[in-house]
């Protein structure tokens, strides 16, 4: 292996060396029939037409035509790896989940890192939140902790999620990323201020995937063996140390090595530098939740660590690269509704929305039997239920067992110990407007107390450098929001915008919009 090449670059050579003592496999069709000639199609004479009987060609071409599956609507670009979670501290007083059963217990895991808004071919070094999803293969089925690298999010009501993502994606006419769309949405929804401030800070462009923290972000509920429950948040802190990329380095890498994050993770694991994260929880009792100064289920806010300290739980360690990217990373499906006994959902509205949205998009992208795909299969649990058939049913379809319940033939029975924790709710049923639920207090604390002067300066520069491409009226709305956080925050951004706006005229792509018709006025006049 050439000394100048990294393991990712030498993957093909490494594969060959591993098989050096083996004879080459016999080339076959998808049905296993040996292939005599893979380089030439069957024709009538050297210049004649192809024959339909050339099943080697049709088998190859038909499969090629169907290689791609729908891209994830968000988190399309990603890297994956496998490893284990090891318990280092006892939290059984909070949760009966088997994953936390005893100190020293190891549970296999799969992890996928990702950017959010970009397509599958986009650069790893863009300013964007990072997905940090963990699948725990437990004896009680899979637990999917579908987190990000930030403890907060842009919105607190799931009905806004499609519009939020649309604003971050491409303009429906120009098919270009549109700063007007991005900043118009953010400026109209000031609950985004906290996440926007985090995003445009130094941590907005992590140095690969190994040097960033992860967060479950949502509020969850833990239930112990006595049926006692608490609310919790999950944190996983990088043991490699936080490292971020400068704007300049990120821009350079996006051209020189757009797959920088994937390459860095693969090479680290291939050379035995296994990345790890220390796993923590925060705990809040139900009584504390009742007297908390704000909604403890609000995804745009954090729980202060001084009041709700981090409690160590264990370690996440990644020690295996994917054997095949498509099989183990592109097809992996994380679902927040996959929660074994001892871990449950809270009233967090965004979490509640994701409980439906994630399995729904997996059924669209991968098919209704996506849990049969090996990387998604809960292989450490025995799956026994009354679900049958459907496209791509890849197992024994549970044989001749009854497919209805209840029945009198000894088929799977319900497990009372798996009953969810009961809780009583009362209140008015309506659509509650949460747009103005204190959008600035924690952002102000972040700006004043967490960031130093140099970091605040870079934050304002990063925001202004992006906001400058939006229209002036949108700039004004955004600056007004930042000013409400802190006068200096708004004034520094405005000063930078004034400089940008004085240096060059605003460029705009004008489109004709008319309700109920796609025809421009001139086109209609010519009808």
UniProtKB/Swiss-Prot annotation:
Indicate which residues form the motif Microbody targeting signal.
524-527
Q: Which residues bind NADP(+)?
A: 194, 201, 203, 213, 237, 303, 305-306
Q: What is the active site of this protein?
A: 75, 148
Task: Name a GO molecular-function annotation.
Answer: heme binding
The cellular location(s) given in this protein's UniProt record come to:
Peroxisome matrix
Residues where Phosphothreonine is found: 511
Per the record, its GO cellular-component terms are: catalase complex; cytoplasm; cytosol; extracellular exosome; extracellular region; ficolin-1-rich granule lumen; focal adhesion; intracellular membrane-bounded organelle
According to its UniProt entry, the function of this protein is described as: Catalyzes the degradation of hydrogen peroxide (H(2)O(2)) generated by peroxisomal oxidases to water and oxygen, thereby protecting cells from the toxic effects of hydrogen peroxide. Promotes growth of cells including T-cells, B-cells, myeloid leukemia cells, melanoma cells, mastocytoma cells and normal and transformed fibroblast cells.
**Official protein name in the record:** Catalase
Q: Which organism is it from?
A: Homo sapiens
The top of its lineage is: Eukaryota, Metazoa, Chordata, Craniata, Vertebrata
């Amino acid at each position: 292996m050439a000394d100048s090449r990294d393991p990712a670059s030498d993957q093909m050579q490494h594969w060959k060396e591993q098989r050096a003592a083996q004879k080459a496999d016999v080339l076959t069709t998808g049905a296993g029939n040996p292939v005599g000639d893979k380089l030439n199609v069957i024709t009538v004479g050297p210049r004649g037409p192809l024959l339909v009987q050339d099943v080697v060609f049709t088998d190859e071409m038909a499969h090629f035509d169907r290689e791609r599956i729908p891209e994830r609507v968000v988190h399309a670009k990603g890297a994956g790896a496998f490893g284990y979670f090891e318990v280092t501290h006892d939290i059984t007083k909070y949760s009966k989940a088997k994953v936390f059963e005893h100190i020293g217990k190891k549970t296999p895991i799969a992890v996928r890192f990702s950017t959010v808004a970009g397509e599958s071919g986009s650069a790893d070094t863009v300013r964007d939140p990072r997905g940090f999803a963990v699948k725990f293969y437990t004896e009680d089925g899979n637990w999917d902790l579908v987190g990000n690298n930030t403890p907060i999010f842009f919105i607190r009501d799931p009905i806004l999620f499609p519009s939020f993502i649309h604003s971050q994606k491409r303009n429906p006419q120009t098919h270009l990323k549109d700063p007007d769309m991005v900043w118009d949405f953010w400026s109209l929804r000031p609950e985004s201020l906290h996440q926007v401030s985090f995003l445009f800070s130094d941590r907005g462009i992590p140095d690969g995937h190994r040097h960033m923290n992860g967060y479950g972000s949502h509020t969850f509920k833990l239930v112990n063996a006595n049926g006692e429950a608490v609310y919790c948040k999950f944190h996983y802190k990088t043991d490699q140390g936080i490292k971020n990329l400068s704007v300049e380095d990120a821009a350079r890498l996006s051209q020189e090595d757009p797959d920088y994050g994937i390459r860095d993770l693969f090479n680290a694991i291939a050379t035995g530098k296994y990345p790890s994260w220390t796993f923590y929880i925060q705990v809040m009792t139900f009584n504390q939740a009742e007297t908390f100064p704000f909604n403890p289920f609000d995804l745009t806010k954090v729980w202060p660590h001084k009041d709700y300290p981090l409690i160590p739980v264990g370690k996440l360690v990644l020690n295996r690269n994917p054997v095949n990217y498509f099989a183990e990373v592109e097809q992996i499906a994380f679902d927040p509704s996959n929660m074994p006994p001892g871990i449950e959902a809270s009233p967090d509205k965004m979490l509640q929305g994701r409980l439906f949205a994630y399995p729904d998009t997996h059924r669209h992208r991968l098919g209704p039997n996506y849990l049969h795909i090996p990387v998604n299969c809960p292989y450490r649990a025995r799956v026994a239920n009354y679900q049958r058939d459907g496209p791509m049913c890849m197992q024994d379809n549970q044989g001749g067992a009854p497919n209805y319940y209840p029945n009198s033939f000894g088929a799977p029975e319900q497990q009372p110990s798996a009953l969810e924790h009961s809780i009583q709710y009362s209140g008015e049923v309506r659509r509650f407007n949460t747009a103005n639920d204190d959008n600035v207090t924690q952002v102000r604390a972040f700006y004043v107390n967490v960031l130093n002067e140099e970091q605040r300066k870079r934050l304002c520069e990063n925001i202004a450098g992006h906001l400058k491409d939006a229209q002036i009226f949108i700039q004004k709305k955004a600056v007004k929001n930042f000013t409400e956080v802190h006068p200096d925050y708004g004034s520094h951004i405005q000063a930078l915008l004034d400089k940008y706006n004085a240096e060059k005229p605003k460029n705009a792509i004008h489109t004709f919009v008319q309700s109920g018709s796609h025809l421009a006025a001139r086109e209609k006049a010519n009808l």
